[in-house]
């Protein structure tokens, strides 16, 4: 048997059933790996909680076999954006450094109720704002991959801790959140699978809000099958979340048939950037490779146009910043947030927010407050919402003639940890993921190969609303051709 840490969730489950090892042994092996990790992926470790859950899993595996699920005894990590009862939840911000929730978020509760073993909380960009996991009060996360010349690279963001932990074999799968690409982009940088479901498919109760009309929980795993297994329990209607969709959750694993003959795959011309920018050539070559894989399996390739794509990124940053400025207004040191005391209340507000919020978070709050101000609301926020509808309509029209859309996930490979990118260049990392987020569509990132620098490159499959099973199946076909690049 190969290294226990490198098994997939499905393989771990199979071995637990066969009693090749116990859930406690599996969990302890992961705890040992976490204690020796150099990636800075885990910021809060919960070994006692994990071992207690593992013992319960072993009891079920031996004495209550009718209660066994595919996640029984499987060690997972939780992005520090999701509330965990009696366990610190900080959003990697100094302003929440001492916050301990009294309840579990719905998706965390559903994972635990399904038998998963929580190993701890994972590093992230502060309040999920970032594409490199360098905006964290706990310090940056390192990608398990290194460039061919030995240079360390970023894991992507904002779910950088989640992607690094899964790619670094510190947990079997991880919970992340995706607002504009925060599951898919780090999955691409780390060479793993990252799935963002349809907006409303998973409850947002207990997920610290960044941009409420965009935020959605997602999963990061090492295989497509594992993504289906981990996504299954966290989906479903939640009466306590007004944005939760009251729709039946299918069995996602049943959709992975690897049969795609006759499926129409849309290739949007607006995502082809190599004719303008030479640095995108490698990504375009991998995109063509993915197209060939699907074509050889019987899929029909259709050229499509998403004409408002070029507006998606600026629209996204206006909307998400506006919503962030509203959501983060509550952290003032009075009811929420770590207070910096002062005799003057205005000074107390200023010191509390000025000292405890990071540079990127403050930048977006300022952008958002400006966009929502009375003199500029119509010119910026209102106009952005109108263009968001046009971006959404592009997808709606395209899905009348195609079943799925195939694009790159990120325009380039992971960049160096010490590379100082300007803000605009950093934002461009989400150029391919943001459109699906604005439309609320499900999308998955799947590794396609390695760059000349021996770093992962990935493709994104976008599906129609609530067709997570379909995008998992397309991703599985690509995975069949590429194999697991982590090997």
UniProtKB/Swiss-Prot annotation:
The active site is at 79 (charge relay system), 158 (charge relay system), 182 (acyl-ester intermediate). GO terms for cellular component: glutamyl-tRNA(Gln) amidotransferase complex. It comes from the Bacteria. GO terms for molecular function: ATP binding; glutaminyl-tRNA synthase (glutamine-hydrolyzing) activity. It catalyses: L-glutamyl-tRNA(Gln) + L-glutamine + ATP + H2O = L-glutaminyl-tRNA(Gln) + L-glutamate + ADP + phosphate + H(+). Its EC number is 6.3.5.7. Disulfide bonds: none annotated. Keywords: ATP-binding, Ligase, Nucleotide-binding, Protein biosynthesis. The keyword Protein biosynthesis applies. Heterotrimer of A, B and C subunits. Allows the formation of correctly charged Gln-tRNA(Gln) through the transamidation of misacylated Glu-tRNA(Gln) in organisms which lack glutaminyl-tRNA synthetase. The reaction takes place in the presence of glutamine and ATP through an activated gamma-phospho-Glu-tRNA(Gln). This is Glutamyl-tRNA(Gln) amidotransferase subunit A.
């Amino acid at each position: 048997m190969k290294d226990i840490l490198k098994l997939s969730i499905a393989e771990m489950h199979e071995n637990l059933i066969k009693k090749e090892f116990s859930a406690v042994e599996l969990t302890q092996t992961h705890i040992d790996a976490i204690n020796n990790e150099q990636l800075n992926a885990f910021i809060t470790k919960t070994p006692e909680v994990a071992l207690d859950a593992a013992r319960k899993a072993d009891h079920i595996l031996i004495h209550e076999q009718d209660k066994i699920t595919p996640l029984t005894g499987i060690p997972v990590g939780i992005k520090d954006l999701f509330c965990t009862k009696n366990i610190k939840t900080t959003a990697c911000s100094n302003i929440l450094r001492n916050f301990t929730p009294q309840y579990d978020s719905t998706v965390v509760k559903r994972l635990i109720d399904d038998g998963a073993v929580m190993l701890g909380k994972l590093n992230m960009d502060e309040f999920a704002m970032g594409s490199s996991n360098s905006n964290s009060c706990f310090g940056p996360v390192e990608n398990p991959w290194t460039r061919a010349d030995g240079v360390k690279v970023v894991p992507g963001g904002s779910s950088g801790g989640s992607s690094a932990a899964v790619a670094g074999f510190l947990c079997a799968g991880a919970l992340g959140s995706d607002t504009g690409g925060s599951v898919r982009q780090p999955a691409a940088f780390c060479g793993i699978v990252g799935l963002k479901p349809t907006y409303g498919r998973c409850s947002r109760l207990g997920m610290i809000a960044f941009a409420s009309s965009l935020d959605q929980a997602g999963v990061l795993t090492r295989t497509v099958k594992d993504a289906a297994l981990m996504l299954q329990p966290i989906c479903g209607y939640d009466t306590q979340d007004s944005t939760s969709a009251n729709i039946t959750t299918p069995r996602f694993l049943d959709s992975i048939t690897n049969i795609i003959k006759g499926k129409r795959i849309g290739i949007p011309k607006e995502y082809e950037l190599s004719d303008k920018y030479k640095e995108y050539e490698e990504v375009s070559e991998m995109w063509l490779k993915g197209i060939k894989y699907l074509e050889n399996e019987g899929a029909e390739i259709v050229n499509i146009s998403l004409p408002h794509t070029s507006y998606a990124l600026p629209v996204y940053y206006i909307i998400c910043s506006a919503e962030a400025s509203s959501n983060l207004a509550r952290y003032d040191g009075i009811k929420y947030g770590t207070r910096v005391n002062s005799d003057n209340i205005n000074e107390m507000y200023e010191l509390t927010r000025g000292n405890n919020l990071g540079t990127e978070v403050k930048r977006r709050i300022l952008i958002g407050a400006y966009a929502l101000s009375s003199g500029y609301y119509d010119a910026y926020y209102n106009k952005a919402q109108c263009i968001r509808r046009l971006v959404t309509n592009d997808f709606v029209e395209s899905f009348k003639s195609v079943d799925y859309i195939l694009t790159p996930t990120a325009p380039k490979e992971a960049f160096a940890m010490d590379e100082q990118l300007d803000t605009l260049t950093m934002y461009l990392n989400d150029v391919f993921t943001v459109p699906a987020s604005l439309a609320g569509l499900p999308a998955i990132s799947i590794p396609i190969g390695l760059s000349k620098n021996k770093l992962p490159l990935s493709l994104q499959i976008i599906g129609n609303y609530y067709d997570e099973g379909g995008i998992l199946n397309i991703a599985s076909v690509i995975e069949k051709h590429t194999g697991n690049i982590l090997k």
